[in-house]
UniProtKB/Swiss-Prot annotation:
Binding annotation for deamido-NAD(+): R145, K178, D185
Enzyme class, first EC level, given as a word: ligase
UniProt-recorded name of the protein: NH(3)-dependent NAD(+) synthetase
Binding site for ATP: G24, V25, S26, G27, G28, V29, D30, S31, T165, K194, S216
Listed EC numbers: 6.3.1.5
Annotated metabolic or biological route of this protein: Cofactor biosynthesis; NAD(+) biosynthesis; NAD(+) from deamido-NAD(+) (ammonia route): step 1/1
Length: 281
């Protein structure tokens, strides 16, 4: 699989006359895998990594992103998007977090998460909820859209492609932002479920610290992917695979199966063809 993906990236970069690749690096497993694949496909001199933290970003993830770029020896730039978001007025939607410990901020956010909606992830997909909840959607989505603009700015200055990091689980469930992290030129891992990305990451010697970190969009403090799904990635991927293959689901939790079906139903309208993806195997 790894060699196929390396060949895919190399072939598509050449086919579409790109000179190299730009990857947004978050400190998570998906961007670590994609950055590694790009380096192996193109060489480190043709890969540029962009790290774009903001006020709510995890300091640990920021350090992991920097450490991983330095480990691979790629050119990278760290740029805070906090000033841009502040200028737009994004942070006025929620109280300032100056001088507050992360633990208090996370408890506050978690309380709002559970208070504003009975099921925040489904309401996110529906684009419904009270005004405060909708403000929350605007609050986190714009962060990805600002990052997309900066990724393309850096890519086009160099004649590079923006290489995305969305996996199949995220794509099928709608765990991405339209015109944000899904707006890219090439998607090399969109055919891989999250659990398969973890397996590939182990094969590619991604640091254990990144592998053990709870997957999170790192847009809202304290909110993880599995918290949004209300199940583990292992359970989610297993159910998704069975649904795609029309396999027997009798040994799965019926409530979780129904939840996944509802997520797929609601997320369908968000899915659209990405220009260049690796064919599913």
């Amino acid at each position: 699989m790894k060699e196929s993906l390396i060949s895919f990236i190399k072939e598509k970069i050449e086919e579409y006359n790109y000179r190299g690749a730009v990857v947004g690096v978050s400190g998570g497993v998906d961007s670590a895998v994609v950055l590694s694949l790009c380096v192996q496909a193109l060489g480190k001199d043709r890969v540029f990594a962009l790290i774009l933290p903001e006020r709510d970003s995890s300091k640990d993830s920021l350090k992991d992103a920097v450490d991983f770029c330095e480990r691979l020896g790629v050119e990278y730039r760290k740029r805070s998007i906090t000033p841009i978001l502040r200028k737009i007025g994004v942070y006025r939607l929620f109280p300032p977090r100056l001088f507050l410990p992360d633990s208090i901020v996370k408890r506050y956010v978690l309380n709002r998460w559970n208070t504003l909606s009975k099921d925040p992830f489904l309401d996110d997909l529906r684009n419904t909820g009270p005004e405060e909840f909708l403000k929350g959607l605007a609050y986190y989505r714009i962060k990805h859209r600002i990052r997309m603009c900066l990724l393309y700015f850096e890519a086009e200055k160099r004649g590079y492609a923006v290489v995305g990091t969305t996996n199949r689980t995220e794509y099928l469930t709608g765990l991405y932002v339209k015109w944000g992290d899904e707006a890219v030129d090439i998607e090399p891992i969109m055919h891989l479920y999250k659990t398969q990305v973890f397996e590939l990451a182990k094969e590619m010697n991604v640091p254990e610290k990144i592998l053990k970190k709870p997957p999170s969009p790192d847009l809202i403090p304290g909110i993880t992917d599995e918290m949004a799904f209300n199940m583990s990635y292992l359970e989610l991927d297993r159910i998704l695979m069975k649904l795609e293959k029309n396999e027997d689901l009798s040994d799965e939790d019926p409530k979780k199966v129904e939840r996944v079906k509802k997520i797929l139903e609601l997320s369908e309208k968000y899915r659209r063809d990405i220009p260049i993806t690796f064919d599913r195997i």
